Amino acid sequence: MEQRAVVRQRQIPPVTLGPMLGTARLRTGLRGRECARLAGIDHAYLIRLETGQRAPSRKVAEQLGAVIAFTAEERAELFAASLPDVGKDHPGKRAA
């Protein structure tokens, strides 16, 4: 069976997503490094999310949702902007 590479298109997140993430994180009382550690993501990646340079994957959105006290509206915005997971562990991704 032939496997085809799965390519994830880079998506520009909504302009409100980054500031909303930073505001919610601060409201929760978390510093950037602490939030990244608790969510299991790299601090530099969290910065890219908060500055609007990246849109989170669905998995990262779930991880952030577990550590940041989002309002219902913020959580909906986060998940609406998230991308399907096609990371290194995704079954559609070819082994290198």
Can you say where each PLM-predicted feature lies in the sequence?
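A short, Lys/Arg-rich alpha-helix, primarily the initiator
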Residues: 1-28, 62
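Short amphipathic recognition helices of helix-turn-helix/homeodomain-type DNA-binding modules
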Residues: 2-8, 58-62, 66-96
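Helix-turn-helix DNA-binding elements, focusing on the entry/boundary residues of the two helices
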Residues: 21, 32, 43, 58-61
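The alpha-helix within a helix-turn-helix
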Residues: 25, 36, 65
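Short alpha-helical DNA-recognition segment
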Residues: 28-48
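Residues in the helix-turn-helix
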Residues: 34, 45, 55, 74-77
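Short secondary-structure boundary/hinge segments and terminal tails
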Residues: 43, 54, 82-83
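Short, conserved catalytic or interaction motifs in soluble domains
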Residues: 51
